[in-house]
């Protein structure tokens, strides 16, 4: 594993472990600039009885601290069984990920089309300007998809261009003048209007951009679809499955699946990594930080407490040298569809309060290094020389080494015994419990 130059990063880790001993500010939930609650952070772009499309608010509108994510958006798509999202394209690149259900994704090119059967864990890049449509072929199960959108025309803004004219959406072809349409299709406008748009307003499809399909239509569409690639994660233009290979971290308390840009050309083009993480109820994903990637975490199933540690903003201003370092702790209780942003170099920890699954998009992912602050393996603190440990911590090098070796698990640990013990002692708040679970 690559060695990291870590003086500043280790300082952050040291701050995390010692944060109960320095000036500490806590920001929770609604005052937390990195937390986007599902109930009030999504805008519904379309909804009917067949499904809905929601767009997360712009990250930099949530907080100036998220300015570096101004070019990224999160889109949530859900559809009922036996439905289709009608053909359209957008002025944005998409990285699509199937959270649950099955799908048939069709990508249309000038002289060809490709259809793929998608399953949970499948991912696919949809290049900007590509016409595509999405079918839920299942008879009983809803389809749930999350997309990372990267607009190409305007920072943080993109438009969907639908071919169909519905009650919810005009066909973009209707933007052309009558004579242009007549010349282009070599037909009278009356025929064009009747065939493509509906001769009268009331003749338009009423369901909107997500409509029902018959069993025969689904059967025909399914026949043309190819299965996603589960043998390789390095596909240049076909879907790949995030969970088809062994997890990079795994034990009895959790599993961590990841594909990095170095392993997949689609992710390399976007400079993004994809992670899918399972954590058992009561378990902890140990404190760690990413060296350069900004992580957008999306809760798929379950609930969790998350704690993030940063340096208070005023530390960036000119200050008297004798002023103490001030640490900011950001807490949030996360539920399904909530989004949390983890800046690069900020240590964080996730405590699952029920069986948990979350997806993570890592922005600026190339050559990112994940540095754990506790646990037996990949622990950056344990790599510090003994002489430096004695200078960095109040305890002796022997005490530090003894403390670090107490935690024999790596990556995921069981926090429940510690939480129960401290609950019986009357301790309040999750932070001491989390620290106690580490060592």
Curated annotation (Swiss-Prot):
Belongs to the 7S seed storage protein family. It comes from Glycine max. Mutagenesis of Ile-145 and Lys-147 allow the creation of a beta-conglycinin beta chain containing a phagocytosis-stimulating peptide, soymetide, found normally only in the alpha' chain. The three mutants created exhibit phagocytosis activities after digestion by trypsin and the order is wild type < I145M/K147T < I145M/K147F < I145M/K147W. Changing residue 147 to T/F/W: Little or no effect on the secondary structure and strong phagocytosis-stimulating activity. Residues 411-439 are annotated as: Disordered. The lineage of its organism: Eukaryota, Viridiplantae, Streptophyta, Embryophyta, Tracheophyta. It comes from the Eukaryota. Expressed in seeds. Not detected in cotyledons or in mature plants. One of its GO terms (cellular component) is aleurone grain. It is found in: Vacuole, Aleurone grain; Endoplasmic reticulum; Protein storage vacuole. Changing residue 145 to M: Little or no effect on the secondary structure and strong phagocytosis-stimulating activity. This is Beta-conglycinin beta subunit 1. InterPro entries: Cupin_1 (IPR006045), RmlC-like_jellyroll (IPR014710), RmlC_Cupin_sf (IPR011051), Seed_Storage-Functional (IPR050253). GO terms for molecular function: nutrient reservoir activity. Residues 34-193, 240-401 form the Cupin type-1 domain. Seed storage protein. Accumulates during seed development and is hydrolyzed after germination to provide a carbon and nitrogen source for the developing seedling. Keywords: Allergen, Endoplasmic reticulum, Glycoprotein, Seed storage protein, Signal, Storage protein, Vacuole. PANTHER family: OS03G0336100 PROTEIN-RELATED, VICILIN C72. The alpha-, alpha'-, and beta-subunits associate in various combinations to form trimeric proteins. Glycans are attached at residue 351. It holds the Pfam family Cupin_1. Residues 430-439 are annotated as: Necessary for sorting to protein storage vacuole.
